[in-house]
Swiss-Prot record:
NCBIfam families: trpD. This is Anthranilate phosphoribosyltransferase. The lineage of its organism: Archaea, Thermoproteota, Thermoprotei, Sulfolobales, Sulfolobaceae. Its EC number is 2.4.2.18. Keywords: Amino-acid biosynthesis, Aromatic amino acid biosynthesis, Glycosyltransferase, Magnesium, Metal-binding, Transferase, Tryptophan biosynthesis.
Length: 342
């Protein structure tokens, strides 16, 4: 720890993993944890440190084994309050590919993936033995971070007291308890893209897309350009996508795709997939399109967007089956009726 706190030097992957293991076992006093996390944030986390911490979090997680699945967990934290597009993207893609959606409560907007799924009627408190059953039944399961990463309770108080972004804000997407080897990762800042991409290239993934969109969202942007890092079997390729690459002929202002609560996010998501709100529909569509390319179901952005539009036609029925298996179907049906009337 002296290397970081006093000398501001990067830790090796091995040292980072050892320190993170000690943190999660509660072996380091809170005052030292606070100094460590603050020093890492001030110095800037290296990709070796992210790899080490991610491996420790994975080792300390309650695991389910479904490595050939996809996750769409982003970091959140962009502060712009967009609807939870990564969650509906996961649900739409699960019509074609198994998805183990790892998530938590809100970081950036008014609702995280856990919040919006609850608003739709889904039960987020899923034990590991049930998780395996659900993903086999419907190709989709939600893995609530608070259940599957119990060791994180040992740093929760310090993180809350500090009130700043720490290395743990980058780790959620890299620590899926199912060991998913396919991943869509939206980042809150373009400044961390290089280090997260390098870290992901060292973490046993088959294919990962990492992106950050204008004007500063952790999603594919309907407003301007999105920078994408595509990682395939450890090799990194970088490029940019513009909303026009998907076939969109208009810019969608960010205020058209935001929500102030989990319930509003859920309603707007349903309005999008039901074709009632074209701005939300297209925002969802471009994010699904990138996921379709990742899983090999689309050649390019435009092809993916067209396929995403087709998939949305069956999404309500698919989502209904998911909630019927694990949730409050009456709540969901009522919400769908409300949206349809409105």
């Amino acid at each position: 720890m002296k290397k970081i706190v006093f000398e501001k030097r990067d830790l090796s992957t091995e040292d980072s993993e050892a320190i993170a293991n000690a943190l999660m076992k509660g072996e380091i006093p809170e005052i030292q944890v606070s100094a460590l996390l603050t020093s890492l944030a001030m110095k800037g986390e290296s990709f070796e440190e992210i790899v080490g911490f991610a491996r420790a979090m994975r080792n300390n997680a309650i695991k389910i084994s479904y490595p050939e699945a996809l996750d769409t967990a982003g970091t959140g934290g962009d502060g712009l309050g967009t609807i939870n597009v990564s969650t509906i993207t996961a649900i739409i893609l699960s019509q074609l590919f198994p998805v183990a959606k790892h998530g938590n409560r809100s970081v950036s907007g008014k609702s995280g993936s856990a919040d919006v799924l609850e608003a739709l009627g889904y039960n987020i408190n899923i034990a590991p033995e049930l998780a395996n059953k659900l993903i086999k039944e419907n190709n989709f399961v939600f893995l609530f971070a608070q259940i599957y990463h119990p060791a994180m309770k040992n740093v929760a108080n310090v993180r809350k007291t500090l009130g700043i972004r720490t290395i743990f804000n980058l780790l959620g997407p890299l620590t899926n308890p199912a060991g998913t080897r396919y991943q869509l990762i939206g980042l809150f800042s373009s400044k961390v893209m290089d280090i997260v991409a390098k870290a992901a290239s060292l973490l046993d993934y088959k294919k990962v897309f990492i992106y950050h969109g204008e004007p500063g969202i952790d999603e594919i942007s309907p407003y301007g350009y999105t920078t994408v890092y595509e990682i395939t079997n450890g090799k990194i390729q970088q490029y940019r996508l513009h909303y026009s690459d998907f076939g969109l002929k208009r810019q969608i202002p960010i205020e058209k795709i935001t929500a102030t609560s989990a319930n509003e996010s859920a309603i707007k998501i349903l309005r999008g997939v039901m074709g009632i709100d074209s701005d939300i529909r297209d925002f969802i569509g471009i994010n699904v399109a990138v996921g379709l390319k990742l899983i090999g179901k689309a050649e390019d952005a435009r092809d993916g967007f067209e396929y995403a539009m087709q998939l949305m036609e069956s999404t309500i029925q698919h989502l209904r089956r998911i909630i019927e298996s694990n949730g409050d179907i009456k709540k969901f049906d009522q919400l769908v009726r409300q949206v349809g009337k409105g």
